[in-house]
Amino acid sequence: MGPTADNTWQRCHRLGMSGPATVEREKIVIRTLVAPERHGDLIGLALADLDAGESLDAGGGLETAIVVLRGIVDVEANGEPLGTAGGRSSVFQGPGHSIYAPPGTALRLRARGSAELAIATAPAPAGAPAKARIIQPADQRIAEAGSGNWGRTVRTILGPEHAAGRLLLGETINPPGNWSSYPPHKHDREAPPQEVRLQEVYFFKVDPPGGFGIQMLYDDAGEKALIVRDGDVARIPSGYHPVVAAAGYSLYYLWVMAGDGRRMIPYFDPAHAWVAESRP
C-alpha cells in the first residue's frame, strides 16, 4: 500500500504547505504551527515574533517550554521576575536560552528588541516540577552525533535527565549535505526496552534561508519524502524519519517530543543499523 493511501502517511504532512493559522494580539503575530485538537496530539507548537517593548503572555493550564530562537526577553513567572533569556541573533550562532514552566504558571516575556520565540506545550501528568526556570546554554547537553556525512550537532535542551512533566525538546544542526535522525529510527510503539512511544514535531530553519532539506517518512506501509524550507513544520506521529540538508545549506530543526513517559529509546531500522556499527 502506498503512502498516500495509508492513514499513517496522511497524518504525516507539512503544515506549512497549507499555511499555519495566524492571529494578531496586541500587535504580536502568533502563528499556530501545530494545533493538538486537530489531530488528537499531545504536542502544541506556535511561533511568536515580538518587536522591542512588546510582551507575550504564555503558560496557563499546559506544561510550556519556550525556546528563544533569536533576540532577548525579560521573563516573569506569576508576576515575579525570573530573569533574562536570549542573546543569539540566529539559531545557527550557537545554543540559546529556553524557559520551562509547569502547568499553572503565568509567563510574561517582554522583548528588549526584535525577538522570535517557539512555544511548545503539552498536557503534563501529576507530579510535574513545581517551579518555572530559565534553561541556560550551560544546562544543555551538547554533542556531536554521528560521523562523516551523517555527523551533526545535537543540543538537548530538555532531556530525560532534566526535570519536566512530559516535554522533551532540543535542537539539531545538519551541516550542508549531511543527514540526521540517522541511522533511521522510530519511536511509535510501547515495547521497552527496545522502544518507547513518543510523538514528535520538527520546526525547520535553513541557512542561507533560500535553501531546503528533505524529510523522509516511512514504515512497512509506505514512504514519502517532503521538501522542507525555512519555517516549515513536520508532524511525526509514527515511522522512521531521517532528514538531510541540501548541499550548500545548513539545516536546523527544533524537535519536540511527548509521550506517556520521558524516556528516549529509539528503534533503529535494522536495514541501516550497520552504519552506526561501522563508524570510526
Task: Locate predicted features.
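Acidic/histidine-enriched, beta-strand-rich ligand/metal-binding domains
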Residues: L198, G210-P280
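Hydrophobic, proline/glycine-rich low-complexity stretches
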Residues: W9-D57, E63-D74, W274-S278
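Double-stranded beta-helix
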Residues: A115-R155, M216-Y218, L254-P280
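Extended, compositionally biased flexible segments
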Residues: G44-R110
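A short glycine-rich, His/Asp/Glu-containing loop-to-beta-strand
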Residues: E24-D57, G148-E200
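Conserved metal-binding segment of the jelly-roll/cupin
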Residues: F92-R112, A122, I227-G248
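Glycine- and acidic-residue-biased ligand/ion/polar-headgroup-sensing regions
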Residues: G60-G83, P176-G177, D188-D232, V244
